[in-house]
Design a protein with these regions (language model features):
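Bacterial N-terminal signal peptides that target proteins for export
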Residues: 1-11
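Predominantly a Rossmann-like dinucleotide-binding segment in NAD(P)-dependent oxidoreductases
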Residues: 29, 155-237, 241-245, 361
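C-terminal helix-rich "cap/oligomerization" subdomain common to oxidoreductases
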Residues: 97-99, 325-367
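Bacterial N-terminal signal peptides
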Residues: 9-20
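N-terminal Rossmann-like dinucleotide-binding module
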Residues: 21-76
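Beta-loop-alpha module in the N-terminal Rossmann-like domain of NAD(P)-dependent dehydrogenases
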Residues: 67, 77-140
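Contiguous beta-strand/loop segments that form the cofactor/metal-binding neighborhood of enzyme cores
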Residues: 220-295, 321-330, 353
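Rossmann-fold dehydrogenase core element
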Residues: 136-154, 174-176
Length: 367
């Protein structure tokens, strides 16, 4: 056998081994997954993946009698998997991880139940309603050595990760400004379910309005982009443009976060004429416009070009693949990760400061 045949054989063997290991990581034994709460509008993310095979729902806990009987999972799972009490469900079904579709205020309650049992948790964004809750959740997670992850839609955008890569390579130079835009026409306007809006528009159960619902995206991305820099201060304006629809909470938020080397402006709104989740990043050598999950514009060397961002590889392209891989210790979750506890503690700190700033009409110093 000549050297070329040997080389070709070794390359084929390496490729086969890689594909086999990748398939094993994604397939393997399904993750034993439980669901806490069914009132969140993002419950469809579970429903749409039920038949995929990477996880198995072993239990659903919902304290509201009506919602426990009337939800999108009810006709797809064995009725015996539904429980009124979270603790009972955890003790009888022994999940590896719990995904949370409760009001944000109840994230703490779920972690208080899961952490002592050694069960990992993934919540929908943001991590918590305030610093007090977030600190307690983090303490429990660290003490009991569980993963406490936060899921954002934008974490799985190809364009965001391509932006990170370009910035890390120095393509646009030193970042000096980031503008983040997240929002839509409003929860009522886009016909969110009543079970969702009942708490989404409640200042206690959700922690706020648009500032929490959409301000968290920008805080999450900015924390990742600014890496080791800590925010110096936060100034925010929270408005009620539609008090007849949202009398208890803000429906439009502008948050200015000052870093030692950059200014970040986070705009979250329930008042825009369309839905959007995009970001403009400016450096001293160029800019990146993250326009959609797949499309972006990049300005370097005096020219703008449009690009389709490369697709993300599993498990980094899907929240459930990611959760399974993290729980099974197939991947690490570094502090810089968008889903990490460290990142999301900072997110809550920024949002908490934004609410304080709007109330006091003053700049809130952080570090």
């Amino acid at each position: 056998m000549n050297i070329h045949k040997i080389t070709r054989y070794l390359l084929m063997l390496c490729a086969f081994t890689f594909l086999t290991l990748t398939a094993k990581g994604q397939d393997g034994e399904p993750l034993r997954l439980a669901v806490a709460g069914v009132s969140h509008g993002h419950l469809w993310e579970v429903i749409s993946r039920l038949d995929r095979g990477d996880f198995k729902i072993v239990g659903v806990a919902e304290k509201d009698d009506y919602l426990r009987e009337h939800n999108g999972l009810r006709d797809k799972l064995d009725p015996n998997l539904f429980y009124a009490d979270l603790g009972e469900m955890l003790d009888k079904t022994h999940p590896e991880a719990v995904i949370v579709y409760e009001p944000i205020y109840d994230h703490l309650r779920v972690v208080e139940a899961c952490a002592p049992r050694g069960i990992h948790v993934m919540v929908e964004k943001p991590l918590a309603v305030n610093n007090e809750h977030a600190t307690r959740m983090a303490s429990l997670a660290r003490e009991k050595n569980i993963l406490l992850l936060t899921n954002y839609e934008t974490t799985w955008y190809n364009t965001n990760h391509e932006a990170f890569r370009l910035i890390d390579s120095g393509a646009i130079g030193k970042i000096d400004r980031i503008n983040v835009y997240d929002g839509h026409q409003g929860p009522f306007e886009i016909n969110c379910g009543k079970e969702f809006t009942d708490w989404l528009t409640d200042p206690v159960r959700n922690g706020g309005g648009a500032v929490i619902d959409f301000g968290c995206y920008g805080a999450n991305l900015a924390t990742r982009l600014m890496k080791d820099e800590k925010p110096l201060s936060v100034y925010a304006v929270l408005r009620q443009n539609k008090p007849n629809l949202y009398p208890k909470v803000d429906d439009d938020a502008t948050i200015i976060v000052e870093y030692p080397s950059a200014t970040v402006q986070i705009m979250g709104s329930w008042c825009w004429p369309m839905g959007r989740k995009d970001m403009h990043i400016y450096g001293d050598k160029g800019y990146i416009y993250q326009d959609t999950p797949k499309e972006m514009r990049i300005y370097t060397n005096g020219k703008e070009r449009q690009e389709i961002a490369p697709s993300l590889n599993a498990p980094y392209n899907d929240s459930f693949y990611f959760l399974k891989a993290a729980v099974r210790k197939e991947i690490d979750v570094p502090p810089t990760d968008l889903s990490s506890l460290e990142n999301n503690l900072m997110v809550v700190r920024i949002l908490d400061a934004a609410i304080q700033s709007a109330k006091s009409k003053a700049v809130i110093q952080l570090f």
